[in-house]
Amino acid sequence: MSLSLNDIKFPMHWNLDPNEFSYVEYVYREGLELGVWRPDNKRDQMAHTNVVSLSRYFWPNVDFDRLVMGGELMLWFFTFDDGLDAGIYDDQKSLELVRRMDIVFMDGILPEDPTGPEKVALRLRNKCLAMCGRRKDTFNRFITSCVQWVDSIIPFNKVKVGGQSPHIELYSFLRKINIGAYPCVTLTEVMLNHHLESYIWADPRWIKMNEDIAIVVTLINDLVSYEKEVNDNAGDLNPLFFFQRQNNVDLCDSYKQMVTLIDYYVDHYVQLEQGFLRTLAKYHNPLQEQEVNFMLDHLHYLITGSRMWSMQTPRYCSPTSPFIEMRKFREA
């Protein structure tokens, strides 16, 4: 059976050309310094490149320093989340790690025996604090989004009750936080030189736009990770898999349902964006309009970049993928 990710349609102006690649090596050296990666370990190097390279798709037009910050965010996501997802910690230890990470972000201090991900988190936090300057509201939004993501990991991993997959609405409600899109958006706000009024980010349309994009990113991630998760016996939390069981349909029909869902959220987002732009006060200078467009472009790039990155990453590509665009190599 051959499915195509190109069945998913986005507006043409959401397309992107990825940023340059040299930051990946820079962030890798940081990972070695902070104890996230083991020296001269090819598996670590491959994992790092696969995950951190996503930043060049999410932030295709930023300078090197900001691209590094995006890479650090991806490095933190991957190393902290995969540790909890791997099942190597019991519930008590997992909760302890979550609470420790919350303190790193909220208080800006490390525990006495810091882990590599905690060191990465503190470095990124301190960079954001310096870049924000007087923009305490921006900094607080970034910290809040990171804490919310950290706090979502354990609840999402517990969402299966009695071995049953959740309803798609419950799944989407939890996953839109757990996917990690919100910290990407608030980090993008940190990157601004900032000529915008802070009330913009409290607009309910803006918040709903973020939610719609997060759900689309989630669904794209579920599509591209389908084969890997099924092979790892983790398909119960993948809607492409559990739609087949819940609705008694085959893979092709399950994919059609996923595409229909994505189409709905993309269309709803476009309507919200149009309303959001109509409600904004008149721009005082061209920089304000540029910064609004910069934020909107980032939302667009989160989903188009996710799909583009997924078509080439060894993390998900495989000769036996159900998606023709992903029938390539896979990492060992």
UniProtKB/Swiss-Prot annotation:
GO molecular function: metal ion binding; terpene synthase activity
UniProt motif (NDxxSxxxD/E motif) ranges: 221-229
Motif DDxx(x)D/E motif per record, residues: 81-86
Catalytic EC class: lyase
Keywords: Lyase, Metal-binding
Catalysed reactions listed for this entry: (2E,6E)-farnesyl diphosphate = (2S,3R,6S,9S)-(-)-protoillud-7-ene + diphosphate
SUPFAM superfamilies: Terpenoid synthases
Keyword match Protease: no
GO term, biological process aspect, one: terpene biosynthetic process
Enzyme nomenclature, EC number: 4.2.3.160
Domain of life: Eukaryota
Known function: Terpene synthase that converts its substrate farnesyl diphosphate (FPP) into the sesquiterpene protoillud-7-ene.
Domain free text: Contains several highly conserved motifs that are important for catalytic activity including the aspartate-rich 'DDxx(x)D/E' motif and the 'NDxxSxxxD/E' motif, both of which are involved in complexing metal ions to coordinate the binding of the isoprenyl diphosphate substrate in the active site.
Similarity annotation: Belongs to the terpene synthase family.
Name recorded for this polypeptide: Terpene synthase 1
